[in-house]
Structure formats: C-alpha cells, structure tokens
Design a protein with these regions (language model features):
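Interdomain hinge/linker segments and adjacent boundary elements that couple functional modules
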Residues: 2-15, 19, 23, 29-33, ...
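Positions that flank functional sites
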Residues: 36, 76, 208
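Base-recognition residues in the alpha-helical recognition helix of bacterial helix-turn-helix
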Residues: 39-40, 44
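C-terminal regulatory/effector modules of DNA-binding transcriptional regulators
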Residues: 178-282
C-alpha cells in the first residue's frame, strides 16, 4: 500500500460507526436527536461523505457504549481523515482512483483500448494525454504526466498491492506516438510484468467476443474487512465508482471470465516481447 487515504479512512470510520449504532439498536433519527444535530449529518458521516471530528466520534461512540482503546482508535481514525495526502497538490485532476489505490491490497484491471496509467511510460502517457486532452496547454499535459509517474513511484515505495491486469491485444498494435515510443513502452511493460506482485495477461484477437466488450473497469480490494471493494470507471471528463455488493459480484465474475479467455501470463510475456522487438526494428 502506498500510504493513508483520507477517503478510505472516512469510509472505514463511517462503516464502523454505523455498525456500532445498529448494535446499540438506535436509529439515525434517535442519535441525531440525542446529540442535537441533523439527521443528514449522521447519515453523511456513516456513508463516508464527510469527515467526523474526534469530538463527533466521541459523542457518537459514547452513545453506543464504546470506551477505552476502541474509543481512542475511532478518534485516531477521525484524525486521519483530515490528513493531506501527497496527491492533494494535484487538485483539479481525477483523484478518486488514487484515493482508493493508495490503500489497496489488490487491483484487478481490464483495459481494452490503452494501457492503464500504472503501466505507462512518460512518453506513452504524454502522447495519450495530448490526443485526449487537446485543449490543454503543454504545462497542463506535463502536470498529468508527472502525476502518473508519482503514482507509480509511490506504489513501489512500500508494500505494493497485487496487480492483475488483462489488456486487449489491440493495445499492442495501436500506435500511440511513434514506433520507438511503443517499443520502449512494451519493453517497460515486460519488465513490470515480471515483478512478483504483477500478473499480466493479453486477451487475443483470436478469442472473438468476450465478457469485457462493455468497456474498461478496475476492481479495487482493501486489506481491512470493513472496507468494501470498489469498482472504478474512468472516461474523458469524468470518473465513477460503485461499491454496491451486487455490482461487485457481477464485475468479479466478468473479470474471471475475461482472464480465463486471455493468454496465460508466460505466453502473454512472449507476445509482448515479440511485438516490442518488431517495433524496435521499424
């Protein structure tokens, strides 16, 4: 994991407070009335939409009969929701994913069009951003490239998450930038795929129709049992997450079908190496 994420900590604190309230057989309305706050405040804290102060946590947990070390742990969790993570300096960029990625224990990715940002070289990332965000000045492009490279660096600083990615074979042939950019990108990808925490598979053209035809998605899992998995979708201009249990089950099943249809990791690596060599000779 790459560090503490205030967003994940808010979700975790909210989940624990909701469980404590339900175990105390109290409704949101009853808690709000006893603490003389609005129903929406309690609801938003429990849903992880807003941070709770240590005082909020103390007042709520006292109602639920919590004392001692458990109380102190909850208050500390509330303090952690106020911390500024390294990515806070990149306001204005899509930050939902990195907020979850920072505390992930495993990340499952399906990419049918372009390589995920965690695998991109600077030149490959720059070429993509330049095409997708043609409205950006050069410094705006460079800021985004820098952000992606920092994400990669931070993920390798501490215990990294398990990464399992399935990429469509089309990615190997779609010319992003020029042949030399693609050559270096695929060589870098081969090196990354050999890391002990990374599994990479290629979904071949020969497989025909597959379970991922609806588009790219990422499933993020966390080490804490109270943290529900998150499904992440990103498109130009917006990002969206789901943590509904039914949706999570569906996308886990989709990913299982996709990786079952993909080439085995060792075969995928050979294909990547061959394609990198072809591009290097152009």
């Amino acid at each position: 994991m790459a560090g503490r994420s205030p967003k994940v900590r808010r979700r975790r604190l909210g989940f624990e407070l909701r469980q404590l309230r339900e175990n105390a057989d109290l409704t949101i309305e009853q808690v709000a009335a006893l603490l003389e706050v609005s129903d929406s405040k309690i609801s938003r804290i429990e849903n992880g939409q807003v941070s709770a102060t240590p005082r909020d946590v103390r007042d709520m947990a006292t109602l639920y009969g919590v004392k001692g070390l458990r109380m102190e742990n909850l208050k500390q969790l509330a303090r952690e929701t106020k911390e500024k993570p390294w990515w806070s300096e990149y306001s204005g960029l899509k930050l939902d994913f990195v907020s979850y990625e920072a505390e992930a224990s495993s990340i499952l990715m399906f990419a049918p069009m372009i390589l995920p940002g965690l695998f991109q070289t600077p030149d490959y990332a720059r070429a993509i951003i330049r095409e997708i965000r043609y409205d950006l000045p050069s410094d705006g492009i460079e800021r985004r490239v820098e952000f992606r490279m920092k994400r990669q660096a931070h993920l390798s600083e501490s215990t990294p998450p398990e990464l399992w990615a399935v990429i469509d074979e089309a990615i190997l042939h779609r010319m992003i930038g020029d042949p030399m950019i693609m050559h270096h990108q695929l060589k870098s990808l081969v090196e990354t795929a050999r890391l002990p925490n990374v599994t990479l598979q290629v979904l071949p053209f020969s497989g025909g129709a597959h379970a991922g035809l609806d588009g790219p998605f990422i499933i993020i899992r966390f080490p804490e049992p109270t943290d529900r998995d998150v499904i992440y979708f990103e498109h130009t201009g917006w990002e969206h997450t789901l943590d509904d249990p039914k949706a999570i089950s569906l996308y886990r099943l989709l990913f299982d079908h996709i990786r079952a249809a993909a080439l085995k990791p060792d075969v995928s690596l050979r294909l990547l190496s061959e394609r990198a060599e072809q591009l290097g000779n152009q």
